[in-house]
A protein has these predicted regions:
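Terminal helix-turn-helix DNA-binding modules in bacterial transcription factors
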Residues: 207-246, 268-271
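Short acidic-glycine-tyrosine-enriched beta hairpin
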Residues: 37-49
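A hydrophobic/aromatic-rich effector-binding and dimerization subdomain
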Residues: 61-125
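…primarily DNA-binding HTH/wHTH and HhH modules…
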Residues: 252-271
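Generic protein-terminus/edge-of-domain signal
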Residues: 1-40
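An amphipathic alpha-helical interaction segment
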Residues: 108-168
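A short, Lys/Arg-enriched amphipathic alpha-helix from helix-turn-helix/homeodomain DNA-binding modules
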Residues: 134, 156-194, 215-234
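Append "Primarily bacterial transcriptional regulators
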Residues: 45, 189-196, 201, 205, ...
């Protein structure tokens, strides 16, 4: 009976601290979804994910929203590769405004898996029950990966807007010399100011540009470093400090890794 004590499929509206992995399908999202400082219209259903330790449930407008929810205790995966692999699915760290919005075809695929799991839970438990359920969960997660990739592409207007705001935020950070006081910008700092989760930001950027958030930060660092090295007389240490590095050696190492030249060699090429 261990399967039933560790995994359950049911409706759950209340707000609570999660002790399980949660996958829930909401038939409707109220038509409008908050995104940053604005709203986007979404009338189709959505799939949400959460991991243990997150506070979930409840609705800001007080309306009761029907959820079809799968809760899985982490112990259910012990002894299976999915116990480790599940931590690699970034969407478990997304926030509610980063819901996976499903087309009718995608919804049919996901709901079929929900029903397969429900059927298995209602059957008599045997030696294969856990194997079958875990394979269905992994199948659902793999489909979710595929569908999120599609969503990043089809909602490119939103994604490109976020990319532009990221570039503006990085420019502002360095142009205002915030780096000399606060250090190099972190992924969490950028995500917080862009009103998205760090995981969603990196996954979205990777889908658009092939590069994650940290790589974008490094690209901007190198761009600003080249400007300072070619247009000012600041020493290498002063350039490193201005860009938020505590030690010039760390700056020089990153610069050479990215450009194949040391800062000194790059500067000499302009003299």
């Amino acid at each position: 009976n261990g399967v039933h004590t560790q995994i359950e499929l049911f409706k759950i509206p209340q707000r609570h601290v999660l002790g399980f992995y949660k996958i829930s399908y909401k038939p409707a999202l109220g038509g409008r979804l908050k995104y940053g400082q604005g709203y986007y219209d979404f009338d189709e259903g959505g799939l949400l994910f959460a991991s243990p330790g997150q506070v979930i449930g409840g609705n800001e407008d007080g309306a009761v929203c029907s959820e079809y929810t799968l809760l899985i205790h982490p112990d259910f995966f012990l002894g299976y590769p999915l116990a480790k692999k599940i931590k690699q699915y970034g969407f478990f760290s997304y926030t509610a405004n980063e819901t996976l919005h499903l087309s009718e075809e995608e919804k049919a695929v996901i709901m079929a898996i929900f029903r397969n799991i429900e059927t298995e839970l209602n059957n008599r438990i045997d030696d294969f029950s856990q194997d079958v359920i875990i394979s269905q969960i992994e199948l659902m997660l793999n489909y979710a990966n595929r569908f999120y990739k599609r969503q990043f592409i089809t909602r490119k207007v939103v994604s490109n807007d976020l990319l532009q705001k990221l570039e503006e935020l990085l420019d502002y950070y360095f142009d205002q010399e915030m780096s000399s006081n606060q250090g190099t910008p972190s992924v969490s700092y950028l995500a917080e100011n862009l009103h998205v989760s760090p995981s969603y930001l990196s996954d979205m950027l990777r889908s658009l540009t092939g590069r994650n958030t940290q790589q974008h930060i490094h690209d901007k660092l190198i761009e600003k470093a080249k400007e300072k090295l070619s247009t000012t007389s600041l020493s290498i240490s002063e350039v490193a400090y201005a860009l938020g590095f505590e030690h010039s050696q760390s700056f020089s190492k990153l610069f050479k890794t990215k450009t194949k030249l040391s800062p000194q060699e790059f500067r000499k090429s302009f003299n």
